[in-house]
């Protein structure tokens, strides 16, 4: 599997690097500074790497509410931030321009990301309204951008949205892999930080044994071993932050706590040793 080729290990842990609200986002105020956002990103990156994660996934987590077609300024700011901190990235990294698959691919091209994550296929409805992802256009765009080495991790049950496809998730997973050649499938709960169903992870892995299956939410030291019994990797965001919270009472991004990362990775290392 490509994960072993990229990381030379099994049961990979991908740490989320959540960017602060960016210029043009509702939570960005006139007094905010892009230089400060860059410094915050650098701090979180160092905490994740020093804590021992295997990879980093950079997203515009605080661009609430998310756009189906992202403003150019948001993508441009993400590219600048990643460019500023890239020399400090010593592990494979990915990008997620949330809810905009085309922007995610173009950002990946600009910063030479190893992988990307996104809602690339399917039809969903949620707080942001109705959206239909045209995977045919996205994969053709990927070809145009010469991104044959870029690995794509697909949400098949995105957080906070309802899939209008009434088939069982396992059937959706199988057809997604067959039609798109997905490199990985992300299994989520209903919201960030919520515990993902381990039975669902196992069912998808059994149905798609040659495809990387990732536990995408709710991974903590007391739950990660049971998830990694079936998942090939896990994406961890909320737990790594100070106090295990996504944001403070004012809606601001909370920084990554290196000690929480080390604690978590210690459990994972023991699990890997069997």
Predicted regions span which residues?
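Active-site mouth loops of central-metabolism enzymes
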Residues: 18-43, 93-100, 154-170, 219-220
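N-terminal amphipathic alpha-helix/helix-capping segment at the start of soluble metabolic enzymes
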Residues: 1-34, 139, 143-144
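Glycine-rich, proline-tolerant flexible connector loops at the mouths of alpha/beta enzymes
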Residues: 49-77, 123-127, 182-195, 244-249
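Conserved, mostly hydrophobic/aromatic
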Residues: 15, 48, 56, 116, ...
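Catalytic cores of alpha/beta
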Residues: 95, 100-113, 171-173, 207-209, ...
